[in-house]
Amino acid sequence: ESFIKKYIGIDVLEARLHELENEMDNDQNKIDEYCNIQNEYIRLDGYNIPYKLDKVLLGLGLNQEIKSKKIKELSGGQKEKVMLSAVLLKGTDLLILDEPTNNLDLKSIEWLEKYLKEIQCPIMIVSHDRKSLDDVVTKIIEIDYFTRNLIEYPGNYSEYKKFKQQQ
């Protein structure tokens, strides 16, 4: 859990909020600092991170015990899932995922696909998992090898393939 909080950037905010709670008294500068930090903490959805983390870890097939372990104690697959959890929870303007379904079992893949369809930000996925691309994406952007131009195709991967075959 501490790794996730550190990655998201709320660990430092939490620590400073606790410091200021003990130091504020009637110091207006510290009260203002506390308000600013709390606003940033709220913007990062810090109060909901424990709940969201539990949901994401469970969805990716990890149990709650993993939160108490250090990263170096985890297997390679567990580390990848924890990193994916951190990326999903960070909250960005654009989510970029490279082979997100690697090392996931079918249940976790289904959960991830559902999660990706529900989030409210654009997602760029690089993947060889054609089924997931069919289930998640709503447009394909191809980089033309010769011109280096981006070509946009509406629909999922299967629709893109059909269009390319008709060309």
Functional labels for PLM-detected ranges:
Residues 1-167:
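ABC ATP-binding cassette signature C-motif
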